[in-house]
């Protein structure tokens, strides 16, 4: 009896994909083959595919059975709980044991015989999937027991906190107003309310505080400097300039000028005591000027009224002689009239 559902093959027969051919059709194929009918004729007569007929007849000739499936059944299961237990025991005693050594030991101890002993690949799979997880769990438990208690996680907020063993220094530094307090075990001592400065981020402030606390000399803290104002400094004396005595400044500002070849001036000369500069004589551009060497005046216009070119200071020669010498030099010069030119 053909099933009421399925697919139709190329010969018009109905079959169900994935299911074996019914036993009645299998038996009929074998009977027709024994009668001497060719497989191609059996396929057309029973409307079964040629491949299915050939396969059923080949299996019947080899095994004498028309039943589908594996002949003799599947291999019995060898990885029993007893075998797994012995494998775990071997692995715990010798963690570096190999799979083939476990297989030989199973045979030597009589746990398995040569027919049901697991293969090397099966033992490796058992070590990896079943025993490996248990061993890792045991190692993790033992490691967890030897580990110290974990430290609390670092809080993350707008105030950067760092793990620091300096708890004593943290107790000394007060918390600025308006800033939430941070636990001393995980926070560094903070003295500045700013949380975005380079020293706070790098932790330099706590190091400087530690050095200042450990040093024998007193170093002012930031709080002490912030409490100081300009009113705390003493006022300068009226006779002092920028906190310094005027006498000391006057002594420093008075200095002696280095000698430069000219005699030093001991006193200042008022403008009223100086004579005006002499007016030069007007000389025609068409006249030749010649004078004796004694007529030149080796002096300066800024010389004193009572001085001469020969002796600029403290000279006894009257000033009128210098002008007389210049007048004589002008008279002794050879002049040419404009009419001669």
From Swiss-Prot:
Cited InterPro entries: Homeodomain-like_sf (IPR009057), PAIRED_DNA-bd_dom (IPR043182), Paired_dom (IPR001523), PAX_fam (IPR043565), WH-like_DNA-bd_sf (IPR036388)
Name the Gene Ontology molecular function terms of this record.
Answer: DNA-binding transcription factor activity, RNA polymerase II-specific; RNA polymerase II cis-regulatory region sequence-specific DNA binding
> What Pfam families is this protein classified in?
PAX
Region (PAI subdomain), start-end ranges: 7-63
**Keywords, sorted A to Z:** Developmental protein, DNA-binding, Nucleus, Paired box, Transcription, Transcription regulation
**Cellular location(s):** Nucleus
Q: How is this protein annotated for GO cellular component?
A: nucleus
UniProt DNA-binding region: 4-130
Region (Interaction with KDM5B), start-end ranges: 168-189
Provide the leader sequence positions. Answer: none
Tell me the segments the record calls region RED subdomain.
82-130
Q: What does this protein do?
A: Transcription factor required for normal development of thymus, parathyroid glands, ultimobranchial bodies, teeth, skeletal elements of skull and larynx as well as distal limbs.
Question: Subunit details for this protein?
Answer: Interacts with KDM5B.
Name of this chain's protein: Paired box protein Pax-9
The beginning of the lineage is: Eukaryota, Metazoa, Chordata, Craniata, Vertebrata
List the gene name: PAX9
């Amino acid at each position: 009896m053909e099933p009421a559902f399925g697919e139709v093959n190329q010969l018009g027969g109905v079959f169900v994909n994935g299911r074996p051919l019914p036993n009645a059709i299998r038996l009929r194929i074998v009977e027709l083959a024994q009668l001497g009918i060719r497989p191609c004729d059996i396929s057309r007569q029973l409307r079964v595919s040629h491949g299915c007929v050939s396969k059923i007849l080949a299996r019947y000739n080899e095994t004498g059975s028309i039943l589908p499936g594996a002949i003799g059944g599947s291999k019995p299961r060898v990885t029993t709980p007893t075998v797994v237990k012995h494998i775990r025991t071997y692995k715990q005693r010798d963690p570096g044991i190999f799979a083939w050594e476990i297989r030989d030991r199973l045979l030597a101890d009589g746990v398995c015989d040569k027919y049901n002993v697991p293969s090397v690949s099966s033992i490796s799979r058992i070590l990896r999937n079943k025993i490996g997880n248990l061993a890792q769990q045991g190692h993790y438990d033992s490691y967890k027991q030897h580990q110290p208690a974990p430290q609390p996680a670092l809080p993350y907020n707008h105030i950067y906190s760092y793990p620091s063993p300096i708890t004593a220094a943290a107790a000394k530094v007060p918390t600025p107003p308006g800033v939430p307090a941070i636990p001393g075990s995980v926070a560094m001592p903070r003295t500045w309310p700013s949380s975005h400065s380079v020293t706070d981020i790098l932790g330099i402030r706590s190091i400087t505080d530690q050095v200042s606390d450990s040093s024998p000399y007193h170093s002012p803290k930031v709080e002490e400097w912030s409490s100081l104002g300009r009113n705390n400094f003493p006022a300068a004396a009226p006779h002092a300039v920028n906190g310094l005595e005027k006498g000391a400044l006057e002594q420093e500002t008075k200095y002696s000028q280095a000698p430069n070849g000219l005699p030093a001036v001991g006193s200042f000369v008022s403008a009223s005591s100086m004579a005006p500069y002499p007016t030069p004589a007007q000389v025609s551009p068409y006249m030749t000027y010649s004078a004796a060497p004694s007529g030149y005046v080796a002096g300066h216009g800024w010389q004193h009224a009572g001085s001469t070119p020969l002796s600029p200071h403290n000279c006894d020669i009257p000033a009128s002689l210098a002008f007389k010498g210049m007048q004589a030099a002008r008279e002794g010069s050879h002049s040419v009239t404009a009419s001669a030119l």
